[in-house]
Amino acid sequence: MVFNCYPVANAEESPMSSQNPTTVAWWSVRMRATGTLDDEPYHVSGAESLVAPGMIEQTVAGLTQRALAPGHTVKARQVRVSLDQLDVEPTIIPALPTELKECPDPVAARQYFVDVLSRFVPHPAEALRVLTEGPTMRGAAMVEAGTDRRLEADPLRGVRVTKFGDLTESAPGASLAHKKHHHEAVLLASKVAAAPGVLAEFCISDDPHYTRGYVCVDGVYTTVTNVKADGDPNGGRVILVDTARADPTTITTWLENHPVLIGPATASSQKATSWHGHLCGRLNAWRAAGLERRPRTFCSAQDPDAVTTDGPALLFSSSDYLGLSTEPKVQQAMNNTVRRLGSSSGGSRLTTGTSVAHHQAEHEIAAWLGYPQAVFMASGYQANIATIQLLADPHVTVISDAENHASLIDGCRLARARTVVVPHADLDVIDTALDCVTTDRALVLTEGVYSMGGDVAPVGELVEIAHRHGALVVVDDAHGIGTVGPTGRGATEELPASQRPDVLLGTASKALGVEGGFACLDETLATLMRNCARGYVFSSAPSPVVAAGVAAAVEYLRTDTRRVCSLQANVAQARLLLAEADLIPPSAAHDRGPIIRIPVGPESRAVAAQEELARRGLMVGAIRYPAVARGDAILRICLTARHTDEHIRILVTSLREVLDGALSDAPR
């Protein structure tokens, strides 16, 4: 037996149950016992407890006795006990209240697991498989609610739950000599339930003779009987998380490294936190992570020389790429329509909400972009969700680019589709993923011009690959329509008919300078969407005033491409100068999108850069988690047709000075 020991306090100090937990120097005592099976190392036993100095001797003795107990399948040949003093104060939480779910047999027990899992994931059987098949990891699987996506960094190791102690018993050191499955599981589950972003936990023990499991959801630990037959060595754990509340790294760090002491369950612990307390806690956690946003208020149109309530600003964060929001022809069309048709649609598209203005907008969009039909809705977000929810369901596999917009991700979640996230613009991986599809149908989902970096997707090649596998292709070109292509028709303009996506999604709130979203598609899909897409059927139609503005904007671009040419010239110049200044990688110098990503790193550095640029009179977006991965914040530059050479020169000079000079000592 090997001890890794450090100097400890007098063992005659009072036991931890009589001490104030906030004034004790707590220690982590860990035991791991190993043996050999078929000449291979074999894990025999392991345990950990946080204890006060006065309980170290008892705890070491109890854990050692457990390691050497004769009941193990394999005899321990080596026992390691380590002691580490904590350098942070533990958080104290109450144990979860407990309930019992009695099931007559494993079939009924596993159906109960599936019923609860189905609240959170589209394919509960896959999560159940982690719980019931042979163990492949020592820790737990972390699964994203809504997508089934596995999030643990190391699939062999899993996510461990460590550094928690027991304040519920008077002699914890002695009690550790014998494993008490239920009590120790409640302690572990209590820490998991307190972690940020955790929604639920499911467990089936891999102990062959312990036939109970548990479900921890809604703040209650429920023991489930007869989850497997006696002698079955299989088991596992699944932790379901909401990545909108906390990212996987934050959750894992909390579970593995944040010390927690679990006290007795109290009356208050058996009740859900009040709504006010719950919402305040979420907001405070968001603020503490440096993620709170405060919008600026404009007093002018979004021209390059804009005015906000904070004063004038040189604007580089607007998606009014062509300046059509102030185009007189667009404004005149809207003014005429409000006098003729009123300011409101008055209903959904299938009741009283469709006007001649809506038909005109759809006709102009479809003809301009080369599709038989267009379906117009209130926003790009709504159009994206409605389209994906119409096309996808649990029998559809969606191959989704890793940098797709949140609206596309949310559409997959609402559709409860089997979603496979592939590396950004990686055609080989997409091809392989389509080869592995086992569902009835498949759909490939991408942006045309990516909203965070401005690079253009290889749409033509992607369509060829997808159609070879019989898959449908949906492209969201919100940032490409009006900005790229010889006449501004977007990322698909120069493609032959055989390489065009089946559905082209777009928005009128960016280059078109108005509002609304749309889907371009064939006659069959358009008719199906108008009858069955929930976002279309059950939402009020956009105002006819908006529809008239969209029709006028499209007509303008159909006959006059000078603004498109000006924008593309500005994008090329800005990318060249930014690359020469080493602010973007050389590969980004040749991207065509009007969005330019300036890598920054930590959220705090991005915010500091944004604030310093604002002091210099420039408005630039600081894009942080969850729009990008945590720790990969960017400054997002949006070019427009109305920026001048001098505007671009000021931008590049200011960025170089701020990022290379004023913030050189900021944390990275």
Curated annotation (Swiss-Prot):
GO BP of this protein: biotin biosynthetic process
Catalytic activity: heptanedioate + ATP + CoA = 6-carboxyhexanoyl-CoA + AMP + diphosphate; 6-carboxyhexanoyl-[ACP] + L-alanine + H(+) = (8S)-8-amino-7-oxononanoate + holo-[ACP] + CO2
Pathway of action: Metabolic intermediate metabolism; pimeloyl-CoA biosynthesis; pimeloyl-CoA from pimelate: step 1/1; Cofactor biosynthesis; biotin biosynthesis
Residue sites binding substrate per the record: 293, 405
Domain of life: Bacteria
Any one GO molecular function term: 8-amino-7-oxononanoate synthase activity
Modified residues (N6-(pyridoxal phosphate)lysine): 510
Known EC number: 6.2.1.14, 2.3.1.47
InterPro entries: Aminotransferase_I/II_large, AON_synthase_class-II, BioW, PyrdxlP-dep_Trfase, PyrdxlP-dep_Trfase_major, PyrdxlP-dep_Trfase_small
Obligatory cofactor(s): Mg(2+); pyridoxal 5'-phosphate
Claim: Ligase is one of the keywords in the record: yes
One Pfam family hit: Aminotran_1_2
Binding site for pyridoxal 5'-phosphate: 380-381, 451, 476-479, 507-510
Keywords for the protein's UniProt record, in alphabetical order: ATP-binding, Biotin biosynthesis, Ligase, Magnesium, Multifunctional enzyme, Nucleotide-binding, Pyridoxal phosphate, Transferase
Family affiliation: In the N-terminal section; belongs to the BioW family.
Subunit and interaction comment: Homodimer.
Entry function: Catalyzes both the decarboxylative condensation of pimeloyl-[acyl-carrier protein] and L-alanine to produce 8-amino-7-oxononanoate (AON), [acyl-carrier protein], and carbon dioxide, and the transformation of pimelate into pimeloyl-CoA with concomitant hydrolysis of ATP to AMP.
Protein name as it appears in the record: Biotin biosynthesis bifunctional protein BioWF
Source organism of the structure: Cutibacterium acnes (strain SK137) (Propionibacterium acnes)
The organism's taxonomic lineage, starting at the top: Bacteria, Bacillati, Actinomycetota, Actinomycetes, Propionibacteriales
